[in-house]
Regions:
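N-terminal catalytic or cofactor-binding beta/alpha core of small enzyme domains
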Residues: 1-149, 154-247
Length: 247
């Protein structure tokens, strides 16, 4: 039976900051870094295989974000909980902020969630993460170090049976000049690099770029790497090497 409250479940810190004194203007964020779900929630009713799948986290994104942080000497904000508990790249009003279904998977532990349990996730995970991201941006703006906000994500080679042709994509709203520089640099390889593909930034469905970037006049993009390119340490380092000069 689902508990009416989740008070005390979220003992792990909601985020970690890697390289807090990084000198790069790039500020990295990895909202879907972790698949961690507190033991009390029994994987939200998912079996082990589903709980390891891309629905729970962005496979390889954390390793890539850490590699970029090291190469660029950039600060990185890392989320410590699964996106299935609450998606940190969704406004709270978005229908899938706490998803009841994800692709082909029902999420039993999110169905019929009480207002108290929902608020516990908001207060324990969502609000502290976004408060910290706001503070990191504030610090840079106050020091007249205009940041470039870069979200690091991954996507699946196939979605609902349809093959995705891109090896990577860059998603953006108002930061078209910055985004196009990155896209142009990556396209020098001759591979398919998506411009606002495989997703499109939508202020009603996205948080990082519209709220922390566009609304504040900060250049902000999401980098999406197809996750079959991030399955090995060599793949991660290859992508970090390719991305770093253009960020």
């Amino acid at each position: 039976m689902q508990s009416s409250t989740e008070s005390g479940f979220y003992r792990r810190p909601p985020f970690e900051i890697v390289n807090p004194r990084g000198k790069s203007p790039v500020l990295l964020v990895c909202e879907h870094a972790s698949r961690f779900i507190p033991e009390e929630l029994r994987q939200l009713g998912l079996d082990d295989e589903a709980a390891r799948e891309h629905i729970a986290w962005d496979i390889g994104a954390l390793a890539l974000a850490e590699a970029l942080s090291a190469r660029l000497d950039a600060t990185l904000l890392v989320a410590n909980y699964s996106r299935l508990l609450i998606d940190l790249n969704r406004p709270l009003e978005a229908p899938d902020a706490i998803p009841e279904h994800s692709e082909i998977y029902p999420i039993p532990g999110n169905q019929g969630l009480t207002a108290a349990a929902r608020q516990e996730r908001v207060a324990s995970i969502f609000e502290p993460f976004h408060r910290q991201l706001t503070e990191l941006i504030d610090e840079r703006l106050e020091a007249q170090r205009a940041p470039r906000l870069v979200g690091v994500h991954s996507f699946t080679p196939k979605y609902r049976g349809e093959t995705r042709p891109w090896v990577a994509g860059v998603l953006f709203g108002k930061a078209d000049a910055y985004a196009n520089r990155i896209i142009g640099g990556l396209r020098q390889s001759g591979e398919a690099i998506g411009s606002n593909q495989p997703y499109v930034i939508d202020p009603l469905e996205d948080m990082t770029v519209p709220v922390h970037g566009d609304e504040r006049g900060v250049d902000a993009v999401l980098i999406e790497i197809r996750n079959d390119g991030l399955r090995t340490p060599q793949g991660v380092e290859t992508w970090a090497e390719r991305l770093a000069p253009w960020l």
